[in-house]
């Protein structure tokens, strides 16, 4: 039976002439038809030939290949995004594996560092502390009324690069690009926001080109009052928004999430998204080895909000697999710069306190050190899994990895710190130090490793496997909150799509070319769980799937019809 493709309805717009060509969400460039050129006063403003979007994308791809550095490629792609968003997303989807590291990690890190230098055109909303009493007016200036997803940062902890001030805006822009490219959320529904509360980066304060508020960061009550004013303004403007907190400093990330997750539909991708993709990866890796995650001993290097968030989700998963909470917590060991977190360690943050090991249980350990180092922990715990979220390069030393491999034939090693310059160890070294026996997953993209004439593909434990599907699921289901169970359902769905589990070979995570399929599946699982949890209206499975399909935007041009303002 012949399949009939339903043509998208015409779009009625009031803009014409040069104004239309300057509107990135509506501009088609050389793809405006002859009729549209007449109707919208575009005759003579474009070359004669009417092109298809694929012809435009092919030209853009050829131009892209002419740039030699990743930052120049990033600037070029951002220019297309600010000129013709539909073409931008068609190009990115056509070359996702090539371009994802350019529009997001690791290249976005350099773009944030050089934000004021490479700035060309405004995108998103910049809310500075001196303008804190004008937030309602600022948000009213946003031309898109139907915003459904906001990614917001204050620029204080950008990847592993620290305080980038207003340059942190590169992260929400890049993140929302992936919401669209991977999760099918229309760019018309997205809004990047930076809260400009100053910067403590002296290099930026001394930079004559720096475009942010030249002031040390506000803190404490002033800071939290400012963020609260922003949250209330967002709720007033877009009551049903999905708000993602991104790259806030450790001291603020967890308090903000705790404070607002039950007030507005929100989540923190650094804490919850990273945890969800990591747990999904570990579930898949454990199943591929014929075991369960609850049978593994896990050591973390890095006990910040991200590391502790991952640990808590691992504990929740192993409880689902049958462990008691106490037994689940005894399997997880957190190491930070002061050593293993124990019940005798002072000045722990509240989210760290639940993840300590009891010193009474460590009496038999083979060590004479008062401060238990990562090597001490690996030697005594004999872990199956080693996870790095320290933001410091080179801390997974050869001695540590070889010690781990001595007791674990197939170690799982996950140096997750971003960007690549901050990774705890390179996949090449880990593969060599374990004689080719380690399963490696990284936070940033790495090329396959060749060791002793064998090719080892390296899985990227990328949050983009998770957050676009969560966003799509929330929008499609109308969920009012994001619960822990919704995040767990995303992890489980990701694990079910593992080629290593399903085929007995290949990567532990799906290929990036399949990420839209994965995002759709996660959206359904998240939406279904939202209904079960009572944070979304219950519908049939068919209705939920239809809502996902209806909300899945594709980078295709629609016919335009003229209307009055």
Swiss-Prot record:
Does the record bear Cell membrane in its keywords? no
Coiled-coil features, chain-numbered ranges: none
The GO biological-process annotations, alphabetized, read as: malate metabolic process
Instruction: Check the record and name the InterPro entries matching this protein.
Output: Aminoacid_DH-like_N_sf, Malic_enzyme_CS, Malic_N_dom, Malic_N_dom_sf, Malic_NAD-bd, Malic_OxRdtase, NAD(P)-bd_dom_sf, NAD_malic_enz_proteobac
| Entry EC number(s) | 1.1.1.38
Enzyme active site = 104 (proton donor), 175 (proton acceptor)
Instruction: Name the needed cofactors.
Output: Mg(2+); Mn(2+)
| Cofactor remark from the record | Divalent metal cations. Prefers magnesium or manganese.
SMART domains for the chain: malic (SM01274), Malic_M (SM00919)
The record's keywords, sorted A to Z, are: Metal-binding, NAD, Oxidoreductase
Entry-linked Pfam families:
malic, Malic_M
Keyword Oxidoreductase attached: yes
**Residues that, per the record, bind a divalent metal cation:** 246-247, 270
GO cellular component assignments: cytosol
Question: Site (Important for activity): which residue positions?
Answer: 270
GO MF annotation: an example: NAD binding
Quote the record's binding site residues for NAD(+).
157, 270, 418
Q: Which reaction does it catalyse?
A: (S)-malate + NAD(+) = pyruvate + CO2 + NADH; oxaloacetate + H(+) = pyruvate + CO2
Q: What class of enzyme is it?
A: oxidoreductase
Record's family? Belongs to the malic enzymes family.
Q: How does it assemble?
A: Homotetramer.
Q: What is this protein called?
A: NAD-dependent malic enzyme
Q: Which organism is it from?
A: Salmonella gallinarum (strain 287/91 / NCTC 13346)
